[in-house]
Amino acid sequence: MKLLFGCSDWMAAWVRARIPFMDPEGFGPCQAIGVADGQGRIVGGVVFHGWNHHYRSIEVSCAADSAKWLSRNTIRGILSYPFEQLGVVRMSSVTRPDDDRTRHVLEALGFTYEGTGRKVFGDADGVSYSLLRDEWREGRFGPAQMEGKLSHG
């Protein structure tokens, strides 16, 4: 898999088209990363939006056409971008309570369930997750894991 940078508008539209409960107006100002397979086909995308400069927080949304788009190295590249390049201290994501696949992915990536917001998506509730920079740094996909692997062979 290959990460694609510099295609934020196009990639944000690609992701938005695959999220059935997405606001039709889109993400607003954002940065996006595409994920291409070995043949160069887009198989997934991640959009960082809702940037709060004062509190250094950002929201993340993602979509995929393949269940195999998240390799360990792809995950590291995607998660390092907001924390290392944008300098955020908190990344959040909101999805529907019945979106078990997304909830499972968020939890596997180290995000913490924060609660349920009522009628976040019009008539549907939303469940909130977050990942803090320190949690990412020490987690399965953070730099502490890479440093440990490099120092142990």
Mark where each language-model region is.
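Conserved beta-strand-loop-alpha-helix junction that forms the acyl-donor binding cleft
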Residues: 93-103, 120-121
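Conserved acetyl-CoA binding element of GNAT-fold acetyltransferases
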Residues: 54-66, 94
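Conserved catalytic-core motifs of GNAT/GCN5-like acyltransferases
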Residues: 112-127
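Conserved glycine-rich acetyl-CoA-binding loop
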Residues: 65-76
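Acetyl-CoA-dependent GNAT
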Residues: 6-55
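Conserved N-terminal entry element of GNAT/NAT acetyltransferase domains
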Residues: 1-10, 135-153
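Conserved active-site alpha-helix within GNAT-family acetyltransferase domains
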Residues: 98-115
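Conserved GNAT acetyl-CoA-binding A-motif
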Residues: 84-95
